């Protein structure tokens, strides 16, 4: 099951998993696009309308997976929101907005973990994934509510891995670098109102440090497939950073010798 599977990273992951023989439940709040995506992906995909901030809907989505397939091997807690594109400073932070972002990004992920564990623990196997972000590794890369929510995810994964290890269930997360997904492009279009989608995508792709390539949705889908597969059978509690070196260093801005008087 993939939450937020109707677009962006979730849709790419759904396609990747299906190509490798999985049957996928797309759990998404978008009741218009979700069924269309499931239809495009084929008979191996099934759509379930799910707002992850409402625990009962997460529980129902997991129950649907169990009713349809008899088991849940992989739970990918991918649904997330960024909040306001041009957020206020901390002194003017809207705590209602903060709660909204945390409700989806953190509480929603915990609900997914909880109900996946509910059905995985009895069978002694399963893989749980969560989407984190490099905004949860460094400050200044996103709005405060979003960054704080993403800082929480690796901690949640490590804390819960301790318990799940006892039952043979693995849990990991992925921290992608910026990718011009529909959500990212939509957010930045408010910041760059005169820019085209192609121009915004170029800006986002230009943020990378690893030259000659760029981070794409398929890169995160491949990372998710690896962590969910038996190839990663001894990997748990891990935050797989897919950022082309973005968070590895900060170059010192020394002036060149000819600039020094």
Predicted regions and their residues:
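Alpha-helical segment proximal to the catalytic Tyr-Lys
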Residues: 118, 162-166, 233
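Residue(s) in the substrate-gating loop at a strand-loop-helix junction
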Residues: 133
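Catalytic Tyr-x(3-8)-Lys segment
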Residues: 192-219
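Canonical Rossmann dinucleotide-binding motif of NAD(H)/NADP(H)-dependent dehydrogenases/reductases
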Residues: 1-25
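Active-site helix of classical SDR
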Residues: 113, 149, 157
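Short C-terminal tail/terminal secondary-structure segment
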Residues: 82, 87, 225, 236-261
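Substrate-binding pocket helix/loop in short-chain dehydrogenase/reductase
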Residues: 86-90, 94-99, 204
